[in-house]
A protein has these predicted regions:
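Conserved NTP-donor binding/palm subdomain of two-metal-ion nucleotidyltransferases/polymerases, i.e.
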Residues: 1-115, 121-401
Length: 401
């Protein structure tokens, strides 16, 4: 078992498996913490498993908790300024995910990782909303190229902050995404149901003394499952988001009222959360998971942990799940081509918060971009072998499905 899978096992909800962490060699923790930082599992590890960690690791993650608590306060203050700017223009909005996940997805908002604030804006006013946020000093990270996915280009505060490898830096300003739809069927190549009523069913939630517009509980869970599924299928899943789903499933296992209203949550995302963290399930959740198409269900039998293992060894096994969910052979061919021959890699920029861009910074950014693309190419090539081997496994499993 890989060390990362030991962490996932230690965070399960169906028993106490924390003792497994003692099997991780002392010298492996440095690399492992870099993985859990990236996967956003460091904070739940600190909260639930501190006494099973080596002393130096425990000291480090307890410091992470304290600094994230300060980050959380600053994030809420940033939200207050943005909300005031939108309200001043009479722009209606709601918040997706983020701090509206409390309390069902996390025990304490101070210890939830959050790096951006996601607004969904009233139809027809998304550009005006971005302009209002821009009045606070936020600018698009990059100019939009081609059709957007679900939101306008990400915006950030150009205040001179620089990334130093610290995921819990209180000085790190949150980024902003302004959404105009909940699901992009043209991009994902299969539909989901229920999004057309999300806006009308929005509610206000009391969070740390403020009234925050948000999705109603059933719609918020549905959107959270779609979010996990979308990122899983594109190979950029944050493991913490799966943990949050498991936390929610475990805490609503006896909530008949909720499950009588929850009609649009994605069963594949719930199955992933159950496979990893084994939450207790309401009968309705289990019934929906059992209703997955046979081929998709078989994928979990073979590749359930592949999205987590991909942090260490790229594999692209999520491609086979996407093929199960997509409709029509033409769409499936598009998915295969998109994953095997990527033509639009993510655009990144070194120190995007820096305000003064001189020739030296331009050269540094160019070198960073070249290095990033080279690393992406290497990761892509490394994934092809495991993908081919997985293809053989999948073909055999699919024939038995």
């Amino acid at each position: 078992m890989s060390d990362l899978l030991r962490v996932i096992q230690a965070l399960r909800f169906d028993g106490d498996y924390r003792e497994t962490l003692r099997g991780i060699p002392a010298g492996a923790w440095g690399r492992l913490l870099r993985l859990t930082d990236e996967a956003q599992l460091t904070l739940p590890l600190a909260l639930r498993c501190a006494e099973f960690l080596p002393e130096d690791v425990r000291t480090r993650v307890q410091s992470d908790l304290a600094r994230n608590a300060e980050r959380s306060q600053r994030t809420m203050a940033a939200y207050d300024r943005m909300a005031a700017a939108l309200n001043a223009r009479g722009i209606e909005f709601l918040i997706l995910k983020g701090f509206t996940q409390w309390p069902h997805y996390c025990e304490d908002l101070r210890f939830r990782p959050q790096y951006d604030i996601d607004f969904f804006v009233a139809p027809g006013r998304v550009h005006e909303a971005a302009e209002a946020v821009g009045g606070l000093g936020y600018e698009p990270v990059r100019e939009s190229r081609g059709p957007a996915t679900d939101h306008l280009p990400t915006m950030l505060l150009r205040n001179g902050w620089r990334w130093r490898g610290d995921y819990f830096d209180p000085e790190m300003p949150p980024m902003v995404e302004t959404h105009f739809r909940f699901w992009n069927e043209d991009r994902e190549l299969f539909p989901v149901s229920g999004a057309e009523g999300f806006w009308e069913r929005r509610v206000f939630r009391e969070i740390e003394g403020r009234s925050v517009p948000a999705l109603c509980e059933a719609d918020a869970f549905a959107y959270a499952t779609w979010h996990v599924l979308r990122h899983a299928l594109h190979g950029n899943l944050r493991l913490y988001h799966v943990y949050e789903l498991a936390h929610f499933l475990d805490h609503t296992a006896a909530d008949d009222a909720f499950w009588s209203e929850c009609r649009h949550a994605d069963a594949a995302a719930m199955r992933l959360a159950w496979e990893w963290f084994k939450p207790e399930l309401h009968a309705a959740a289990r019934e929906r998971m059992n209703a997955l198409p046979r081929a998709a269900s078989r994928w979990f039998d073979v590749f359930a942990f592949s999205p987590a293992l991909a942090l260490e060894t790229p594999n692209k096994h999520e491609l086979f799940l996407h093929l199960c969910l997509a409709q029509g052979w033409r769409n499936r061919a598009r998915i295969v081509a998109r994953r095997l021959l990527p033509t639009n890699p993510p655009r990144v920029e070194k120190d995007p918060h820096v305000t003064r861009v001189d020739l030296r910074m331009q050269l540094q950014r160019m070198a960073f971009r070249v290095g990033f693309l080279a690393r992406r190419a290497v990761l892509h090539m490394r994934s092809l072998g495991p993908l081919a081997l997985g293809g053989v496994q999948w073909w055999r499993a699919w024939r038995r499905a």
